[in-house]
Design a protein with these regions (language model features):
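Acidic-glycine-rich active-site phosphate/pyrophosphate-binding loop
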Residues: 87-102, 178-189, 312, 343
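Metal-dependent amide/peptide-bond hydrolase catalytic core
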Residues: 1-5, 9-15, 36, 187-389
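Acidic/His- and Gly-rich active-site-bordering loop/insert found
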Residues: 2-107, 130, 135, 332, ...
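Acidic/histidine-rich catalytic neighborhood of metal-dependent amide-processing enzymes
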Residues: 114-185, 387
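Glycine/serine-rich anion-binding loops at beta->alpha junctions
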Residues: 104-119, 345
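Short glycine/proline-enriched loop/turn "hinge" motifs that connect secondary-structure elements
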Residues: 90, 133, 177-182, 243-248, ...
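Short, solvent-exposed loop/turn elements at beta->coil junctions and helix N-caps
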Residues: 55-61, 172-174, 235-240, 330-331
């Protein structure tokens, strides 16, 4: 390991990580109201003497309360961009969003998704800047807003900031995910025929048909060729009315997370096949669907030369290089459309994100900070990757 890199990694401060992570989690920052988190992170950078800029991301006309937080080390153009998102989903339960600690584990809304990753990026920046080592090649680190909703922070960032290699700090337990699932969000609509509730056979029940349609879709998704390539999640369903009648209307939202090998057309065929079967069984109910959002997945070659600095950083940080797939939708889908090689890699477990017991392990956040610091040193130093693909 190079002397400068070793010195920087040794300076990663566990106490500083813990303090900032707790403060960040305690700063409630749902999408479109992220200013508290931006203030916490910008204050940490300012205290450490790390220069930054704010990029406005207006939600409505005249809104000046939202902004991406951007740091650049070294000259332009950038050879590396690291990205975290400061927003969380909204609080949905009475337990509160605040941080609580149990030994090495920090619980709280956004702990894994992804304030742990943001804190690791901040700590890496502080360690590198305090070491006083000049960057020969440009490094960008951005903390964006809006990821949990529209991705408007990332959309604004890519207008002016780009690099051949982009690292997204979403929770992967530090597995380098060079492949990323696609995402399709679909609304299902069923319109039936109203009748008295005591004689349901005289009508067409929109709720019954909807349930049958959704179960058919789920059942088909668990059959070849889809197992392990497709995750189906019925997210919302509502319909009927308070009166003593057969339900005339029902709507549902259903999510499809699909491997890069599954196309939008494959999902469309799955929906239509289920539609045909259910329509035959429920002739008095009309079924239709609308695709609301499609974000294609991607898979990058593990031999791409642009991965060189990341591979070396894993070695420097003492971590195993075993690439995997990221199974969720994220801002990575947006960045990948620009031609950058996008890799998802951060502390935390995706399975606990958005849950009541969301948490992240402090030692993993510390490992992430070491990895990011090593990557900044590798990419910003003498050995720089070409733009070859």
């Amino acid at each position: 390991m190079k002397k400068d890199t070793a010195r920087i990694l040794d300076s990663i401060d566990r106490n500083r990580i813990t303090s900032l992570l707790i403060e960040a989690i305690n700063s409630y920052s749902p999408s479109f109201a992220e200013s508290q988190a931006v203030e916490v992170f910008s204050a940490a950078l300012e205290k450490a003497g790390v220069p930054y800029t704010l990029q406005p991301v207006p939600w409505t006309t005249g809104d000046d309360s939202r902004a991406n937080l951007i740091v650049q080390l070294g000259p332009s153009p950038l050879v590396l961009l690291l990205v975290g998102h400061v927003d969380t989903i909204g609080l949905w339960h009475e337990g509160g969003h605040g941080a609580r600690r149990n030994d090495d584990i920090i619980y709280g809304l956004g702990a894994a998704d992804m304030k742990g990753g943001c804190v690791a990026l901040i700590e890496a920046l502080i360690a590198v800047v305090k070491a006083g080592i000049p960057m020969k090649h440009g490094i960008g680190v951005a903390f964006v807003v809006g990821e949990e909703e529209s991705g408007d922070g990332a959309q604004e960032l890519i207008k002016t900031v780009s690099a051949p290699l982009t690292i997204i700090g979403e929770p992967t337990a530090l597995v380098p995910c060079t492949a990323h699932y696609g995402y399709l969000e679909t609304r299902l609509i069923s319109t039936g025929q109203r009748a008295h509730a005591a004689v349901p056979e005289a009508g067409g029940n929109a709720i019954n048909a909807m349930l049958a349609w959704m179960m058919k879709i789920i059942g088909q998704s668990q059959s070849p060729p889809f197992p392990s390539q497709l995750a189906v999640n019925p997210r919302e369903i509502h319909g009927g009315e308070p009166y003593f009648v057969v339900a005339e209307h029902c709507e549902a939202l259903i999510d499809f997370h699909v491997s890069p090998d599954v196309t939008r057309e494959d999902i469309e065929m799955l929906i239509r096949t289920a539609h045909k079967s259910v329509s035959t069984a429920h002739p008095l109910v009309h079924l239709e669907h609308q695709h609301l959002l499609w974000a294609p997945g991607f898979r990058h070659s593990e031999e791409d030369q642009r991965l060189g600095s990341l591979r070396r950083a894993y070695e420097q940080a003492g971590l195993s290089w075993q690439p995997g797939d990221f199974r969720s939708h994220s801002d990575a889908n947006i960045f990948n459309t620009t031609g950058t090689l996008t890799v998802v890699c951060g502390p935390g477990d995706l399975a606990v994100a958005h849950g009541r017991e969301e948490h992240v392990r402090l030692d993993e956040v510390e490992q992430a900070a070491r990895l990011y610091a090593a990557l900044i040193c590798e990419a910003g130093g003498d050995q720089v990757e070409s733009g070859s693909r």
